[in-house]
């Protein structure tokens, strides 16, 4: 209402002034306090532990380092641009040079090993040749020693029997005695047909018992 006082229009005035015949107002409930409740010692919250991570989620140290290296290489190449590409090309070129140098050294070592093996084989061949030559020389020396021994024995024999050999050679040079020739010619007169041969042309030859008779045929007259 206009013109009324605040004290008369407030809630206190309304409570104090009640209409006659109306029931008494119900008791009002106290308003809840807005202050937070005091913490009790028994209701202190305990710190909760986080559940342990599974072993599969833990990555090894080497894997982490590899990932970091890959990330750094990709980031450096992506961020650097042409400079990163040039650095990578230079690194690849350096590695290629190192590989070429290692290959050259390996080829040199292989060539030296082959040369050494060839020299060893040649030395073995020369050793075999020298051994065969020594064996041949030993055989020849043995044969020469045998020949020299035979010559020495022949010289000794000649020195011991030289006079006898000279006498035998002188005796062999003499001619046959005439008595042997006469006896050989005289044998022809011992047989009856031998004398006829010596006196050919002087008379008929006597009949020889060893002369063959002519064949007897059916028409030949019998004596």
Curated annotation (Swiss-Prot):
Post-translational modification: Ubiquitinated, leading to its degradation by the proteasome.
A GO term from the CC aspect: nucleus
Protein localization: Nucleus
UniProt feature, compositional bias: Gly residues: 73-84
Range of residues in the leader sequence: none
Domain of life where this protein originates: Eukaryota
UniProt keyword Transferase, yes or no: no
Any Gene Ontology biological process: regulation of cell population proliferation
Broad class of the protein's primary localization: nucleus
Quaternary structure and interacting proteins, as annotated: Interacts with TMF1; may regulate TRNP1 proteasomal degradation.
Protein name from the UniProt record: TMF-regulated nuclear protein 1
């Amino acid at each position: 209402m206009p013109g009324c006082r605040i004290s008369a229009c407030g809630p206190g005035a309304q409570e104090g002034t009640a209409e006659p015949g109306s029931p008494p107002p119900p008791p009002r409930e106290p308003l809840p306090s807005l202050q937070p409740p005091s913490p009790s010692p028994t209701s202190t919250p305990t710190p909760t532990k986080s559940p342990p991570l599974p072993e599969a989620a833990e990555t090894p140290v080497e894997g982490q380092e590899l990932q970091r290296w890959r990330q750094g290489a990709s980031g450096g190449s992506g961020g650097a641009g042409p400079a990163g590409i040039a650095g990578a090309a230079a690194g690849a070129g350096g590695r290629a040079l190192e590989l070429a140098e290692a290959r050259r050294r390996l080829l040199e070592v292989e060539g030296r090993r082959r040369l050494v093996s060839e020299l060893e084989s040649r030395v073995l061949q020369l050793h075999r040749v020298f051994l065969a030559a020594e064996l041949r020389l030993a055989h020849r020396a043995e044969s020469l020693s045998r020949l020299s021994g035979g010559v020495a024995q022949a010289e000794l024999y000649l020195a011991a029997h030289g006079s006898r050999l000279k006498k035998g050679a002188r005796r062999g040079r003499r001619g046959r005695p005439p008595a042997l020739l006469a006896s050989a010619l005289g044998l022809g007169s011992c047989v009856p047909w031998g004398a006829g041969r010596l006196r050919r042309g002087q008379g008929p030859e006597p009949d020889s018992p060893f002369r063959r008779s002519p064949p007897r045929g059916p028409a030949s007259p019998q004596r």
